[in-house]
């Protein structure tokens, strides 16, 4: 900028030129302004929109063009946000749960009104195709519906007391402030899972989104703000601080944050876990996944191939549940591989702009991801692997790569055991189901897995104590595409956290065991006499 000014260009002219380069000023992206976004956006909300950190730009992975400017928050902004969120909690926790559920229902309805626009923003800023972008927003809508019903069924158990004239029961209460640190690959849904359940269980929320997807976070927060204000609820209940690692560090180490929900890599998750545990805070970790599909000899191959393609190349291989290993019985290995290569070849012409309805594979999120893709392909080849399809970076604007199939590697090759966040599929052989299960379980993570079989004995072996060690254990469906009704999460270095359905709501509450003596006597437990 200084160089341009010194060349004689005025500051006003320079600002005009820079503004014209922003995608938000291109009529093609009119949905951005319909979501309330502008050229310059405050990345902090704590009841008011304000920020005092560095001004950054959000970029579109499809062409690496700047979308709009965002002024990040800093630690001082975070301090205001956490203070205001704590104040909002003090009122919200006393609102009856069904009323909280009604407000969450309205959030879902508000999201419905902007479903297409918000889905397009997710696609533009993250890089996933339009169908997946809209589907991600739909997940937030669905979890709002789920949480609304949950608001009338949050339950604690009543137990028989061994003492006469006594009642023994559980009482569940909100935790306080829930801190949500979300990842770039699901910039809307991960917050939605946490936000809906945290609100309905009586908590306030402070959201620190991924640094590369701030516009989605700002647009979502604007919609939530409208609902809270319309219901005379302190809008700081859902606070937002866009920023870098200093903001995340402040949140993780802050004793005022009762639960930290972190979605990201296992490496960073380990650090987050240690820091939160050091202050005896509560944790919800959703980390990496080196997921596998097992294809048994009796599998329906007409189901296997489309399921594998969806799970391996959907979101350009950037889901935590992406299939990265395909473990195929040696009797059907050649047949599966040939079908898979043909399927991949059909999609090559449909790699492109995620907002194009014909596109089925979008870009990687940034150039760093492209670099990791190239490094993993090179390592696979150096380790004796054969590139059956792909293995190349596409020479065009944006961060596009060919989805890749690799064969010929040992199942315990370092590159196979390591999660690469890109569309690289390692195809492996096995002879017995026990061998395949062992291969599935040998990686450090334990998120998602699937077995394709028509043998009911195999199904229950797979689901049992000597089967998959993952948190998600599927049969005859892909590893990705989980429904919101079940608990989502994994074991080992995936972190052990559970979000979304089932009893995941319990992680956002504290449990008290209450013994009530309604008699006029004072008997002690276990028949103890203390006289």
Swiss-Prot record:
Keywords, ordered alphabetically: NAD, Oxidoreductase
Catalytic reaction(s) noted: an aldehyde + NAD(+) + H2O = a carboxylate + NADH + 2 H(+)
InterPro entries recorded: Ald_DH/histidinol_DH (IPR016161), Ald_DH_C (IPR016163), Ald_DH_CS_GLU (IPR029510), Ald_DH_N (IPR016162), Aldehyde_DH_dom (IPR015590), ALDH7A1-like (IPR044638)
SUBUNIT field: Homotetramer.
Active-site annotation: 286, 320
GO MF annotation list: aldehyde dehydrogenase (NAD+) activity
UniProt feature coiled coil, ranges: none
EC number in record: 1.2.1.3
GO biological process: aldehyde metabolic process
Binding site for NAD(+): 264-269
Marked site: Transition state stabilizer: 185
Gene designation: alh-9
Protein name in UniProt: Putative aldehyde dehydrogenase family 7 member A1 homolog
UniProt record similarity statement: Belongs to the aldehyde dehydrogenase family.
Tagged with keyword Oxidoreductase: yes
SUPFAM superfamilies referenced in this protein's UniProt entry, alphabetically: ALDH-like
